[in-house]
């Protein structure tokens, strides 16, 4: 009865070709659109290693004055990353739910990430619930700061959420804030990616069933092993929030990710989100998920 919730995204296991970049982000968007794994955010910023236009060093042999009037006169394009996007499908047979999610994110100045996520949760025979998420993430400490290999990336983030249909007594709008640390360990026989953080939330079942009037602190974590240059596998955990009269189940998943190339990633997972018919907590049962992610 191994109910490892293989959540949606194979979390940050970028292949070895990505490990050399200081601010390199995992090319994945979680269910709420944030750069991260299925349930959890990562400290890395979305697609921070890419830019629309790279800064070009001045050529001392050229004496022509710089051209004016261009969109990049102020170096804007050299500070904006290209976007990344992800699409999710989650099937939870025990609770008869089909969960679809689309998300996109980009970063500025290798310091700030902005994201948007759209979710549609369709219970069999019931009304489809739609949810919108607007996120931002600030990189407080870059990974390996000062050439110290033991320093993880640390980020502070927030997600503004809106749900179309919520139960009586809950709010339609909520806000989550989190602090997360992420570290890629390359000194082991196989590279290991570890991530963990604290979440302050008023979301019931991530906001699908509305937002409580009070906040609770929970924690989350991820561990991924890079098995091959283009293959990773890992485990994800998210603690459920316990509100008065409402206890969310803990979420878990076991996942595998195939980095098809440096732009395209395919993820598959088995997910366990508590007992679907439990009496002590609100769970969604187990199921499977597949997702496809693309980084420009």
Question: Can you name each region flagged by the protein language model?
Answer:
Residues 1-8:
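Bacterial N-terminal signal peptides that target proteins for export
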Residues 14-22:
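C-terminal segment of classical bacterial N-terminal signal peptides
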Residues 24-188, 199-204, 227-231, 243, ...:
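Transmembrane beta-barrel domains of Gram-negative outer membranes and organellar outer membranes
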Residues 208-213, 217-296:
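Outer membrane beta-barrel transmembrane domains
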